[in-house]
């Protein structure tokens, strides 16, 4: 309906998410962290092919909300995820928070990651209000879908599973209380 809106999103996705200065895998983890936090099933059930090709595994997505306590994430990933967490949940950011980020990222990387998280969060909240489901748009396409969501039938089965990440009775959409590991 509004071509400029489409192109704004498409250009941001290409220039900031796909390309950009920060590690793509880190941006992908932050994107899914936001999805899990705001319960955007549309975005949370997609995966970056580029991130998968560079080593991100499906297990890396499984418990992002509890990233601080998990050994699967390195200190750089945890720092970036803490940035996504602070933006998503409006957490206070003190000097120690910024020192942690600056230990792992340049100023341009921090700007890009912060911008990407902010854009992602707004876009995901908007998509959630539209209640758009995969396979309603571009039916028959399976590109970038998470395992178990490649077809309309698979999506329905996965969403019925007891351990589906976006079930309303899960603890996914709860403001985190974790603190950075010492």
For the regions a language model picked out, list residue spans one by one.
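Hydrophobic alpha-helical segments
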Residues: 1-182
């Amino acid at each position: 309906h509004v071509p400029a809106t489409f192109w704004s999103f498409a250009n941001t996705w290409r220039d900031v998410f796909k390309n950009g200065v920060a590690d793509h895998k880190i941006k992908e983890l932050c994107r899914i962290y936001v999805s899990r936090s705001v319960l955007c099933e549309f975005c949370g059930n997609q995966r970056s092919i580029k991130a998968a090709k560079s080593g991100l595994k499906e297990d890396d997505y499984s418990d992002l909300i509890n990233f601080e306590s998990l050994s699967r994430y390195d200190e750089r990933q945890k720092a970036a995820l803490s940035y996504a967490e602070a933006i998503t949940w409006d957490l206070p950011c003190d000097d120690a928070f910024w020192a942690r980020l600056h230990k792992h990222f340049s100023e341009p990387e921090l700007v890009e990651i912060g911008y990407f998280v902010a854009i992602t969060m707004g876009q995901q909240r908007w998509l959630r209000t539209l209640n758009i489901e995969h396979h309603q748009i571009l039916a028959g396409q399976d590109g970038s879908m998470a395992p178990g969501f490649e077809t309309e039938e698979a999506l329905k089965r996965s969403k019925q599973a007891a351990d589906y990440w976006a079930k309303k009775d899960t603890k996914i959409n709860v403001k985190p209380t974790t603190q950075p590991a010492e």
